[in-house]
């Protein structure tokens, strides 16, 4: 990201050539060195009037040279621990190259920081430089190596950070510059740290710009299969859209924010599906459908969530509604066909279970479990009633003869 207004590739973690979620399956402290004692500031010794014995018997020049040669040299100050192991696992380390000015402070979570970043591979190959990279600290807008190391720096400080690939671009890398599983060296200068924007005082266009930045970060995390961070970024985007405002907005701005909210909710649902958070995904889809009942992506994902929960009878009509809106969509066709087969298998299993419960599976018709379940009890009931009535009549006849 070259500036705060328009984040560039490193800030947004975007993978070149990655789709922007249009499909259904895809979205869709360092110690200072000890200094020697400085005696220049001490007050002068008082004049005692008469020299002491030691003063009266000062050694000559040869003696002074001998004493100087035989005096042990002062022990050097212990070297400071240069590298800070940030997480204690040796995979993310930081060393101060240039300390910050005296009195400078460290940034806080939620502040907007601006850094000068130089990124290199372990062999020294420079792969990226950002003179003015701005991001919100703690919002996961950048790679974790930056988000974890910058809070330990003073404003004005320059530090070297070495990071394992898991805190950078992971197993996917970032083609064509950063190969998969690549550890990186980051030279970071913390230039400024300012409080984040007051959401209530943002104009409509400022809200749109902020929400779009968070959404793009979420898309980049999703492409790297980091669905937890993706969901976090989409949540932040939705918060920027839906938070209270003290600024009047035009109808066009409100409509633009609504469309952006729908996109973020759809992408959030996709991330929640990947994390198997079905109830949360169902809520996200339902919120989309409240605004846009014919939103195909929301219908598709809602049907898929219900299918994952085994609710095939509810999922199939929803997918059919989505297919009716877009009959040529092969993804919906395939999912619907799969669910129809699963429902048929589910019904077959239920029928077999009913037969087993009734204890006479051979006499029960497979196509009409309800009728078969009641046919035998009613026949026995009528037969037993007839026998009982016959017995009563016979008793009456015998009693009359007697």
Curated annotation (Swiss-Prot):
EC number per UniProt: 5.2.1.8
Catalytic activity entry: [protein]-peptidylproline (omega=180) = [protein]-peptidylproline (omega=0)
Tissue and organ distribution: Detected throughout the embryonic body, in caudal neural tube, limbs and head. Detected in adult retina, brain, heart, kidney, liver, pancreas, lung, testis and urinary bladder (at protein level). Detected in adult brain, kidney, liver, testis and trigeminal nerve, and in embryo. Detected at lower levels in lung, spleen, heart and ovary. Widely expressed in forebrain. Detected in the Purkinje cell layer in the cerebellum and in hippocampus neurons.
Keywords: Apoptosis, Calcium, Isomerase, Isopeptide bond, Membrane, Mitochondrion, Phosphoprotein, Repeat, Rotamase, TPR repeat, Transmembrane, Transmembrane helix, Ubl conjugation
Signal peptide interval: none
GO biological process: apoptotic process; BMP signaling pathway; camera-type eye development; cell fate specification; dorsal/ventral neural tube patterning; dorsal/ventral pattern formation; multicellular organism growth; negative regulation of apoptotic process
PROSITE patterns registered for this protein in UniProt: FKBP_PPIASE, TPR, TPR_REGION
GO molecular-function terms, A-Z: calmodulin binding; disordered domain specific binding; identical protein binding; peptidyl-prolyl cis-trans isomerase activity; protein folding chaperone
Membrane topology per record: Single-pass membrane protein
Main location: mitochondrion
Protein role: Constitutively inactive PPiase, which becomes active when bound to calmodulin and calcium. Seems to act as a chaperone for BCL2, targets it to the mitochondria and modulates its phosphorylation state. The BCL2/FKBP8/calmodulin/calcium complex probably interferes with the binding of BCL2 to its targets. The active form of FKBP8 may therefore play a role in the regulation of apoptosis. Required for normal embryonic development.
PANTHER family in the record: PEPTIDYL-PROLYL CIS-TRANS ISOMERASE FKBP8, PEPTIDYLPROLYL ISOMERASE
The protein's name in its UniProt record: Peptidyl-prolyl cis-trans isomerase FKBP8
Name of the gene this protein is made from: Fkbp8
């Amino acid at each position: 990201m070259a500036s705060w207004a328009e984040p560039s590739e490193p800030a947004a973690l975007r993978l070149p050539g990655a789709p922007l979620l249009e499909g259904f399956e895809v979205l869709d402290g360092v110690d200072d060195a000890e200094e020697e004692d400085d005696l220049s500031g001490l007050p002068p010794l008082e004049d005692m009037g008469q020299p002491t014995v030691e003063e009266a018997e000062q050694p000559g020049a040869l003696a002074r040279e001998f004493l100087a040669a035989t005096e042990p040299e002062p022990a050097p100050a212990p070297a400071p621990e240069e590298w800070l192991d940030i997480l204690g696992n040796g995979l993310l380390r930081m060393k101060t190259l240039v300390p910050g000015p005296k009195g400078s402070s460290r940034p806080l979570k939620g502040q907007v920081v601006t850094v000068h970043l130089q990124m290199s591979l372990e062999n020294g190959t420079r792969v990226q430089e950002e003179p003015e990279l701005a991001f919100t600290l703690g919002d996961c807008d950048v790679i974790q190596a930056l988000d974890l190391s910058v809070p330990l720096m003073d404003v004005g400080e320059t530090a070297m950070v070495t990071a394992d690939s898991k805190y950078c671009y992971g197993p996917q890398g970032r083609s064509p510059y950063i190969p998969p599983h690549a550890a990186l060296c980051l030279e970071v200068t913390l230039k400024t740290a300012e409080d984040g924007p007051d959401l209530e005082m943002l104009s409509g266009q400022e809200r749109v710009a902020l929400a779009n930045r968070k959404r793009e970060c979420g898309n980049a995390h999703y492409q790297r299969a980091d669905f937890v961070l993706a969901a976090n970024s989409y949540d932040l985007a939705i918060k920027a859209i839906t938070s209270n405002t003290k600024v009047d907005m035009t109808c066009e701005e409100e409509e633009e924010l609504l469309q952006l909210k729908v996109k973020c909710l759809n992408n959030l649902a996709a991330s929640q599906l990947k994390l198997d958070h079905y109830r949360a995904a169902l809520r996200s889809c339902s919120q989309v459908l409240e605004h846009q009942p014919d939103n195909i992506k929301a219908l598709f994902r809602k049907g898929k969530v219900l299918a994952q929960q085994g609710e095939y009878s509810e999922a199939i009509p929803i997918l059919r509604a989505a297919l009716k809106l877009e009959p040529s969509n092969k993804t919906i066709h395939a999912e619907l066909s799969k669910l129809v087969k699963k429902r048929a298998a589910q019904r077959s299993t239920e029928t077999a279970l009913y037969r087993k419960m009734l204890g006479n599976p051979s006499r029960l018709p497979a196509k009409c479990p309800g009728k078969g379940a009641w046919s035998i009890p009613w026949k026995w009931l009528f037969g037993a009633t007839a026998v009982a009535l016959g017995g009563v009549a016979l008793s009456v006849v015998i009693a009359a003869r007697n």
